[in-house]
Amino acid sequence: TGDNNILDAGEVINFNSTTPGIYTLEDFGNNVSTLIADPTDATNTVVSVIKGNETWAGTTITSGTVIYPLTATNTVMTVRVWSPEAGITVRLKLEESADATHTVETDAVTTKAQEWETLTFDFSNEATNDGNPTNPLNTDYVFDKLSIFFNFGSVGSSETYYFDDVTFVGAATTDPVTGSELVVNGDFQAGS
């Protein structure tokens, strides 16, 4: 987080530092999280998560020490994840550590099995619980607590997931339009 405790756009939370710092792990719902060598790159340290038996089992990465500065236009974070299966819902939740009612949650779904991928989480698209929306993004809140939930909404059976490189991207990006051509015919009319 640079010289302050604000995770600015482009900054990354990773787990390679051997110096005790502001990033701590706290499990709930019978999750078990540990720092381990990346199973695909032993020079990198990642978080291993064994999914607990509760549908809401998760891991908090810091509480009350890092500020995640969401705004109306800066709503996107990414996390690099490894999942045993594709199609797994991963939820990120931000909240104020001093007021558990001040939250925002969003989901992403894995597309790869047994390999790393980067998932994008846009907090302007709040998650749902049993078809009901969770709290919408309120940029007046000071989010300083981040939790991750693997296979959210499903009972765990000790599956192992990994994550690393929590990044505050900031603004959502729009993919370029592909599959169409612009033909210039000299007078700005549609060409053929």
Tell where the protein language model's regions lie, with residue ranges.
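Beta-rich carbohydrate-recognition modules and glycan-binding surfaces
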Residues: 1-192
